[in-house]
């Protein structure tokens, strides 16, 4: 029971730390379900299905694999995502990964600084 309580406290602290770092950077932050799969979602119908069925606020292709490996190895992890497109028919044209990545790096660094200080 003590281990579970410590894990929940750590999880809460990690989430709050990430949110605080994003807020300090003036970046909108949302917490919620992120759907993950093995393909780039560029289809409004599929996007709507994921949102309606799983209440997903986003979808991606990498975080689920990392989380699964961490779970198998009994290693705790958190996934922090930056949204780069709208996961619809215009996704390929609206993808702006480089700009999103550049905006995200300082937030991740600040979150780590806050978490470990």
Which residue ranges define each predicted feature?
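Glycine-rich phosphate- or other oxyanion-binding loops that anchor nucleotides, phosphorylated ligands
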Residues: 1-2, 14-117
């Amino acid at each position: 029971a003590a281990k579970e309580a410590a894990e929940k406290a750590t999880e809460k602290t990690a989430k709050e730390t990430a949110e605080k770092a994003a807020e300090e950077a003036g970046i909108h932050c949302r917490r919620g379900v992120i759907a993950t799969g093995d393909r780039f979602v560029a289809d409004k119908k599929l996007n709507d299905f994921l949102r309606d069925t799983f209440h997903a606020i986003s979808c991606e292709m990498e975080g689920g694999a990392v989380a699964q490996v961490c779970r198998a190895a009994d290693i705790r992890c958190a996934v922090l995502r930056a949204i780069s497109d709208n996961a619809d028919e215009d996704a390929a044209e609206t993808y702006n990964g480089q700009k999103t990545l550049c905006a995200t790096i300082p937030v991740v660094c600040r979150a780590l600084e806050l978490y470990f200080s």
